[in-house]
């Protein structure tokens, strides 16, 4: 099978790109990232030559490189001979993110359009690839009361008309030839846990196919859309109903072989309600502890709201978990057995107060569990602070930034902060993928990334569409 040539923008450490490469159907011919540590990580793992731009206002994009510079500097004419099939990426999304703050601060892009987004459009107009993948945070859909999302979809679909308006933002003379717009063959918020990622992480994904390739009318487009939706909804596998869990990716074994480990982990929490002594703690005992069976399969089904599980279906789901662990490279390799040279397996520094606090916060609970006690955290009003992941449920979203209490916490009572490698596993990075930079920079690289497994599924869906046209 042929491999489609791909250009990546806003590439970060390469999570999205790695998934496309792992699919076996795409090869990355050029990438761009403004942050040097992330670009170094990308180069050393994905093999593109690193080029660091100087002070010149304009640089020609060079095939076979990842260029560390502002996308505004890039002259895409250097890639015209590549005949790019696909452009992938998503402009930095902090301003769109719901996690970042209240609604008034969720600005998105205004009607004049954000500068970085406009450069993604510039690449489409200049290079006219067969298809594109644009990913971003779900909050983009509602930013500016939905105006940002509407403008983006219309820009992609009516690029031949909108390009004259957009190119003024990026000070570009643009493409001298005809500019084709794109048929949107998929747009939606994708829950990556339904694709096998052991984490509740949602992203907006938009996939476009160049209009001259999308001929055949409504019926053809509907068929292509249905094909992508079938993959990205997770319905091709049982994982959309039976999610992969943190205990599996940390231990390197499927659930049905982790019964003793699970029981050991949960029994450590016996009596925590008496230590904390609050009504919330005693309510947790009634609501959670008293309902535990300590049978890993029964509790897994209960915690994930899976009712009427068919025995044969459950067995098939557990087999898919084993296959997936092997696909990820985690099978038979507990994360705590790893000693990697990039510092990601090193135990993080933890103050005594944090350790003592976390000993009183059970899985799936947060700092509010110890409110009104001597372990209370002052001035904390958001639920993601000091939150423990649960061994049998997809973890909460791995975040890139934040101060005390936002680093992610292990389900084992004898553990507190997750290591960077544990965070990388929750993001489905292979253990062979090494990160470069200072620890806060590595944390950001991991947290900002699209999970490679999710990217691989997106790539597989896109390859089916490109093969069909």
UniProtKB/Swiss-Prot annotation:
EC numbers, comma separated: 2.1.1.37
Keyword list, A-Z: DNA-binding, Methyltransferase, Restriction system, S-adenosyl-L-methionine, Transferase
Catalytic activity reported: a 2'-deoxycytidine in DNA + S-adenosyl-L-methionine = a 5-methyl-2'-deoxycytidine in DNA + S-adenosyl-L-homocysteine + H(+)
Domain of life: Archaea
Keyword DNA-binding included in the entry's annotation: yes
Enzyme class: transferase
PROSITE patterns according to UniProt: C5_MTASE_1, SAM_MT_C5
Biotechnology (record note): This protein may be useful as an epigenetic editing tool due to its high thermostability.
Temperature dependence: Optimum temperature is between 70-90 degrees Celsius. Highly thermostable. 34% of the activity of the unheated sample after incubation at 90 degrees Celsius for 10 hours. Lowest activity detected at 10 degrees Celsius.
A GO MF label: DNA binding
A Pfam family per the record: DNA_methylase
Flavoprotein recorded as keyword: no
Single biological process term from Gene Ontology: negative regulation of gene expression via chromosomal CpG island methylation
Domain spans labelled SAM-dependent MTase C5-type: 4-469
Residue numbers annotated as active site: 93
Family per record: Belongs to the class I-like SAM-binding methyltransferase superfamily. C5-methyltransferase family.
PANTHER family: CYTOSINE-SPECIFIC METHYLTRANSFERASE, DNA (CYTOSINE-5)-METHYLTRANSFERASE 1
Descriptive protein name: DNA (cytosine-5-)-methyltransferase M.ApeKI
Organism field: Aeropyrum pernix (strain ATCC 700893 / DSM 11879 / JCM 9820 / NBRC 100138 / K1)
Biological classification of the source: Archaea, Thermoproteota, Thermoprotei, Desulfurococcales, Desulfurococcaceae
